[in-house]
């Protein structure tokens, strides 16, 4: 019953990495070169790979699950509903994120240093959302999952209404950051619950669906 809270801690790490990684790599690319920024990525990923080998314990396997048994979860209607939901929600979130800087620059008309600060606020709010998600899913997962798309929809509409006012925009983006953190946990929970008999395959489908949504969302937006 504590699984949602444990997963939320993992997403906190992911969000923290984005909060720190985006400004650091942007700085390296602008002040040194794009090649050095890519080298930074390489070194960071290599360190994570080594740390995973050294510090992450092997997960005990209760019973071996065949490839056929894992693929059979794709016959479940709930799995496909979850895959579609993850693709659409992640597409919406990253579609918005892909043009947020441009929107702040052209519509809200704020300088780039302020945009960087707003992006930092969004990232930090994302971490808060991750922490909240674990508690919300533990209390009432169904309610959290059902309400989230509507909360995102209302927030996106508010962006267009208050787009010219920086103060209001910061508040809405702060709320969106929290909602995005909650939504990320909700999406993983949906797919994991749809296929509890094949957790590794379910996690793979979550990442595939999320990446597909990111690709479609950023391309369309």
Q: For each predicted feature, which ranges?
A:
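A late C-terminal transmembrane helix in Major Facilitator Superfamily
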Residues: 194-221
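C-terminal transmembrane helical hairpin of 12-TM major facilitator-type secondary transporters
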Residues: 143-187
């Amino acid at each position: 019953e504590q699984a949602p809270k444990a997963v939320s801690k993992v997403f906190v790490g992911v969000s923290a990495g984005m909060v720190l990684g985006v400004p650091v790599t942007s700085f390296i690319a602008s002040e040194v070169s794009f090649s050095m920024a890519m080298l930074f990525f390489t070194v960071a990923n290599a360190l994570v790979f080594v740390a995973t080998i050294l510090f992450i314990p092997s997960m005990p396997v209760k019973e071996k699950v065949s490839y056929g048994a894992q693929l059979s979860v794709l016959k479940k209607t709930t799995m496909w509903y979850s895959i579609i939901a993850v693709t659409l929600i992640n597409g919406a979130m990253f579609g918005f994120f892909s043009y947020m800087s441009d929107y702040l620059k052209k519509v809200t008309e704020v300088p780039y240093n302020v945009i960087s600060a707003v992006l930092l606020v969004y990232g930090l709010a994302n971490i808060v959302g991750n922490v909240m998600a674990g508690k919300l899913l533990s209390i009432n997962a169904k309610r959290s999952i059902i309400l989230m798309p509507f909360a995102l929809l209302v927030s996106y509409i508010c962006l267009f209404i208050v787009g010219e006012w920086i103060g209001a925009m910061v508040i809405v983006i702060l709320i969106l950051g929290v909602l995005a953190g909650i939504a990320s946990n909700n999406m993983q929970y949906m797919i994991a619950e749809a296929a509890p008999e094949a957790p590794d395959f379910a996690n793979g489908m979550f990442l595939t669906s999320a990446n597909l949504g990111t690709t479609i969302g950023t391309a369309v937006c």
